[in-house]
């Protein structure tokens, strides 16, 4: 890699000079490509941890993604719930891989590193493809949540992931003259260009969806913030990483801030989805207590609701049910009907003897 390399489409020279990407150690000459400035390492026992601040951020991203995933799963009747759930599962998968690769827990010199880096690259491609397809769920080309919708999303994401996995493997291994560590056009397209195209299509599709079908225009702000965070993450990673690294004396670099910006972008995706989907409470089966529970002391068969009745405006004495009796008098605050009002006072002018046998038929 030449010093002060200029940006060139299809080449990682400029990018790997400015940012410590997962694929960079496998590109270029036998020594790989390394950034001119990178964050400090820490040693835990015999293990050296690269990018420690970024690793902590990856863990925080896992926690936030889990929280968002649980919130999405709780909206049982929301449109596109199962599709967006798959997106968050894939994001969690990518973040798990990033922890082991960014930190060099799997050393770059290890013979398994190229395979893990290729799996990571394939997972990133599948993640962005899943986001792109989620952008079309709202147009209802197929009914969301159906086997057709879900299996198309899963199978197509698997196919895209396989392609984005195979190209890095071929590039790292140098299987042909068109794919080698020094000829990286294919990897450049699948690893860098393809994700940007997916985000662009998702943004445009959701803007069209909001403008054409929704009355609420405030959700456009979520989309704008999502796009802004994503663009900021790309620029911080590719353009300003070395500047940041030098300014803070190698404590962090652009990888840290780009990871943070991408996390914010994912949070905006969740915020946007949550804003445009409504929960149908009538058919919701959430983990909360039943929304439509009716705790009516008049229908109680024992002392269970007596306290609620006594604290009401009538102090347990008002509220006519039959013949001027309230719930406590009618049921006698006893289990069952053993002390019914008919048995105690009779019915009308017949008195106690004209009742129904002290509460029994």
Curated annotation (Swiss-Prot):
Q: Name the GO cellular-component terms.
A: endoplasmic reticulum membrane
| BP terms from Gene Ontology | cell wall organization; protein folding; protein transport
TM segments? 48-68, 86-106, 119-139, 150-170, 184-204, 218-238, 250-270
InterPro entries found in the cross-reference section: Chs7
Gene from which the chain derives = CHS7
Q: List the disulfide bonds.
A: none
Q: Which domain of life is it from?
A: Eukaryota
Q: Which family does it belong to?
A: Belongs to the CHS7 family.
Q: Which UniProt key words apply to this protein?
A: Cell wall biogenesis/degradation, Endoplasmic reticulum, Membrane, Protein transport, Transmembrane, Transmembrane helix, Transport
Put simply, this protein is called Chitin synthase export chaperone
**Localization per record:** Endoplasmic reticulum membrane
Q: Name one GO molecular function term.
A: unfolded protein binding
């Amino acid at each position: 890699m030449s010093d002060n390399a200029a940006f060139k489409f299809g080449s990682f020279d400029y990018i790997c000079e400015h940012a410590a990407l997962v694929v960079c150690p496998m590109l270029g000459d036998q020594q790989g490509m390394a950034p001119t400035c990178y964050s400090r390492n820490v040693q835990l026992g015999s293990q050296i941890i690269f990018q420690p601040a970024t690793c902590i951020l990856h863990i925080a991203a896992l926690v936030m993604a889990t929280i968002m995933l649980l919130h999405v799963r709780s909206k049982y009747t929301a449109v596109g719930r199962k599709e967006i759930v798959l997106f968050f599962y894939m994001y969690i998968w990518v973040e798990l891989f990033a922890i082991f690769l960014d930190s060099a827990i799997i050393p770059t010199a290890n013979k398994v590193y190229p395979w893990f880096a290729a799996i990571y690259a394939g997972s990133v491609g599948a993640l962005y493809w899943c986001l792109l397809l989620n952008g079309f769920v709202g147009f209802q080309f197929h009914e969301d949540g159906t086997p057709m919708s879900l299996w198309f999303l899963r199978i197509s994401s698997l196919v895209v992931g396989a392609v984005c996995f195979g190209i890095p493997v071929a590039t790292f291994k140098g299987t042909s003259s068109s794919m080698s560590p020094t000829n990286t056009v294919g990897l450049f397209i699948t690893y860098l260009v393809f994700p940007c195209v997916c985000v662009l299509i998702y943004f445009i599709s959701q803007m069209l969806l909001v403008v054409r079908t929704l009355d609420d225009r405030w959700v456009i702000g979520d989309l704008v913030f999502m796009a802004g965070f994503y663009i900021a993450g790309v620029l911080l990673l590719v353009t300003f990483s070395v500047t940041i690294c030098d300014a803070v004396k190698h404590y962090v670099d652009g990888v840290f801030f780009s990871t943070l910006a991408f996390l914010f972008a994912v949070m905006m995706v969740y915020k946007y989805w949550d804003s445009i989907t409504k929960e149908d409470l009538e058919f919701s089966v959430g983990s909360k207590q039943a929304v439509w529970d009716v705790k009516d002391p008049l229908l109680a068969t024992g002392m269970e609701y007596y306290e609620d009745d006594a604290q009401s405006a009538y102090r347990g004495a008002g509220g006519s049910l039959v013949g001027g009796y309230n719930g406590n008098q009618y049921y006698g605050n006893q289990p069952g009907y053993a002390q019914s009002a008919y048995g105690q006072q009779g019915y009308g002018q017949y008195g106690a003897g004209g009742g129904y046998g002290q509460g029994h038929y």
